[in-house]
């Protein structure tokens, strides 16, 4: 059932089978101290009025680092981002709380719009009033629920001293792997329900991301994000029906692209020529060098790729060097996955890039034209999608 299906089943059973006053959501790949649960429970009990109590995220592989302190929604691009005054990736080992100069922001109040479901305690009253999560499988179900709860009078607080350890986003490829489909599709679904006004900021951020993916030879990412737009435009019933089939569909699509095929090691391929190694080391640091690098990347992408580099890589890049300014100037390189489990062989294909770009532009144009219609459609279906009855049909409960 994935994230939202699993979380929805938890809430459904908690409401049906127990009289528990709270539902605690946590990821299954975290490390936690029991004190965090006790603190979340204590704060929930003593809150003046019911509220969602969220935990912060510490870096599982660098345990003194506070990876996520508190987040809000950027209502222009409709994307989550760090809340004002938060300290991103704060290292308590180097700057403890008593360090007044470097830790002062950790002592101030941080207001958030929601909290990730790596750890979040939800009052029973909230669930009984606003319903279950949306059938989104993974990504954005937590934010949709927080925004819905806030509208119903149940705010979220992310509390210092309540936290879990979780793998940092920088150690994952979820912005470019199969999860990229759910990131975009569900972002559009939630925006249609909770975003007011123009979507120009959303479309601008989408266009920028697509251009970056194409320059980085991430063709599979663009292909599945195009599919995400199509599935969003197909409507809420279609999105719910996709719960059991979306992941295998996306996995099959990705297999058609070399950038999505993970090889155990770069040694599976011929030794690199090394001619593109320097591109990953020379990071543009000022506007002039950035413009020059962008120009070189665009010019390179307008030319047909040299087929030799689809047989012998020009370089092996670690994730930190696999950026637009390096990948945009090559025809074929291997890139290590963020989690280190292997490499992908990214191969530039001008015709494929142009086809994906045209497809994306046409879909974005349709999205702009039809978004007011989709906004009405998704809002009309919202109550049904989050109802116990809807989820009973998904679960196969008579």
Per-region residue spans from a language model:
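A short, glycine-/small-residue-rich helix N-cap motif at loop->alpha-helix starts
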Residues: 1-9, 31-33, 139
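Conserved donor NDP-sugar-binding/catalytic core segment of glycosyltransferases
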Residues: 34-88
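Short beta-strand-to-loop acidic/aromatic patch adjacent to the donor-nucleotide binding site
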Residues: 20-31
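Active-site nucleotide-sugar/metal-binding loop of Leloir-type enzymes
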Residues: 9-22
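A recurrent flexible, glycine/aromatic-enriched loop bordering the glycosyltransferase active site
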Residues: 85-119
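Donor nucleotide-sugar recognition loop
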Residues: 111-119, 124, 128-147, 153-159, ...
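Terminal low-complexity segments of carbohydrate-biosynthetic enzymes
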Residues: 185-398
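Nucleotide-sugar-dependent glycosyltransferase catalytic core
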Residues: 155, 165-183, 224
């Amino acid at each position: 059932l994935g994230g939202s299906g699993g979380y929805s089943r938890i809430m459904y059973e908690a409401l049906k089978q127990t009289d528990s006053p709270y539902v605690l959501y946590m990821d299954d790949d975290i490390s936690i101290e029991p004190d965090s649960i006790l603190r979340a429970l204590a704060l929930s009990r003593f809150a003046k009025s019911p509220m969602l109590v969220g935990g912060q995220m510490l870096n599982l592989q660098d345990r003194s680092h506070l990876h996520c302190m508190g987040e809000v929604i950027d209502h222009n691009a409709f994307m989550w981002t760090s809340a004002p005054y938060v300290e991103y990736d704060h290292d308590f080992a180097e700057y403890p709380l008593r360090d007044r100069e470097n830790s002062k922001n950790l002592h101030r109040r941080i207001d958030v719009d929601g909290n990730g479901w790596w750890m979040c305690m939800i009052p029973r009253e909230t669930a009984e009033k606003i319903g279950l999560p949306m059938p989104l499988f993974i990504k954005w179900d937590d934010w949709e629920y927080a925004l819905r709860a806030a509208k119903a009078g149940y705010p979220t607080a992310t509390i210092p001293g309540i936290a879990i350890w979780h793998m940092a986003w920088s150690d994952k490829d979820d912005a470019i792997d199969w999860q990229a489909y759910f990131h975009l599709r569900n972002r559009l679904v939630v925006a249609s329900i909770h975003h007011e006004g123009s979507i120009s900021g959303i479309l601008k951020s989408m266009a920028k991301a697509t251009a970056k993916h194409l320059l980085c030879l991430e063709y599979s990412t663009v292909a599945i994000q195009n599919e995400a737009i199509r599935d969003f435009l197909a409507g809420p019933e279609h999105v719910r029906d996709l719960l059991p089939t979306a992941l295998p569909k996306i996995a099959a699509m990705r297999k058609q692209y070399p950038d999505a095929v993970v090889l155990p090691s770069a040694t599976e391929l011929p030794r690199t020529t090394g001619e593109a190694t320097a591109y990953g080391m020379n990071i543009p640091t000022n506007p002039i060098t950035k413009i020059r690098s962008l120009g070189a990347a665009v010019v390179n992408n307008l030319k047909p790729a040299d087929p030799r580099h689809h047989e012998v890589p020009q370089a092996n890049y670690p994730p930190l060097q696999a950026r637009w300014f390096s990948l945009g100037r090559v025809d074929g390189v291997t890139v290590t996955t963020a989690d280190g489990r292997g490499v992908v062989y990214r191969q530039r294909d001008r015709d494929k890039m142009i086809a994906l770009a045209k497809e994306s532009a046409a879909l974005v144009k349709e999205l702009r034209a039809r978004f007011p219609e989709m906004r009405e459609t998704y809002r009309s279906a919202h109550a049904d999608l989050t109802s116990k009855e809807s989820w009973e049909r998904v679960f196969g409960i008579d």
